[in-house]
Amino acid sequence: MAYIEMKHCYKRYQVGDTEIVANRDVNFEIEKGELVIILGASGAGKSTVLNLLGGMDTNDEGEIWIDGANIADYSSHQRTNYRRNDVGFVFQFYNLVSNLTAKENVELASEIVTDALNPEQVLTDVGLAHRLNNFPAQLSGGEQQRVSIARAVAKNPKILLCDEPTGALDYQTGKQVLKILQDMSRQKGATVIIVTHNSSLAPIADRVIHMHDASVKDVVINQHPQDIDSLEY
């Protein structure tokens, strides 16, 4: 069995008298330590997949296997523990606590899990050793996003889920953030899943899952993923 598997997953929403199918018979596998890009236009169903993998929503049909456990069968309490202990989230907007320093924001991870990584070391890993005591307002957008990545990574999660992590960043800063995520996969063995509409990012991934109209249309394995340093997008 693969590290992550979605099997015949459906997610439906009721809007008035209309049923919206957000995920239709979604199937794919992800191996441990891969950097994966889920690619598709707005409304393709990719963020719904991310919400299901992260335990933020429940599917209506199908199985979602993470490291040997079918989280689709989890109770509400089990899903809460799963989100807290096993998943790191990185979003387009940074969601940092404004009156806490960079180090204190990352230290929040130690209040959630018992085996949190050292905040100073994680911030050093993302290139912010010199910014430990700065507040979010004193940081650039790219630096704030790196703090949010450090906070997610400090939980030592099984999977790192990223929803358009470079969407609010300029080109050069976006490349810096993507390099951190690629290094997390290659050097730290993290399983990183990035949701994006930007198809030019596909070459950096080990696996690219193409979504369209709520379904997986294609899965491409990159035998030789491109280094982010050499990517132009």
Where in this protein do the model-derived segments appear?
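ABC family nucleotide-binding domain
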Residues: 2-211
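Conserved beta-strand-loop-alpha-helix hinge in the C-terminal portion
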Residues: 215-233
